[in-house]
């Protein structure tokens, strides 16, 4: 992955998570936390190690900016069920909403 592509992924990840919590900045910004087994290289267009580093950097930056951060363990079966119940398709926005819902943030 090129540095420019990584920058775009970082920006999209932060943007999606912040859009969900922006109506209430007191809510934590939630991100999904994957294991190597349930991480999707095709979805994120990066390797698992890159994602872990990115997650650490983003979380640290948000904490330094005064935001709360929560990491939610990703459960693929639970996520698929949630998508079906909400009649949604897989996207960065829906993954962020799913993480926020599990992290007691707002749902879409």
Can you describe what each PLM-predicted range is?
Residues 2-44:
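Extended, charge-biased low-complexity segments
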């Amino acid at each position: 992955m090129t540095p420019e592509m990584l920058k775009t992924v970082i920006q999209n990840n932060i943007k999606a998570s912040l859009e969900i919590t922006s109506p209430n900045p007191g809510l934590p910004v939630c991100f999904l936390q994957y294991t190597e087994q349930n991480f999707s290289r095709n979805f994120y267009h990066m390797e698992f190690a890159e994602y872990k580093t990115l997650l650490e950097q983003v979380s640290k930056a948000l904490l330094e900016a005064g935001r709360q951060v929560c990491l939610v363990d990703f459960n693929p079966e639970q996520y698929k069920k949630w998508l079906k119940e909400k009649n949604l398709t897989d996207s960065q926005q829906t993954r962020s909403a799913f993480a926020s819902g599990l992290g007691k943030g707002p749902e879409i």
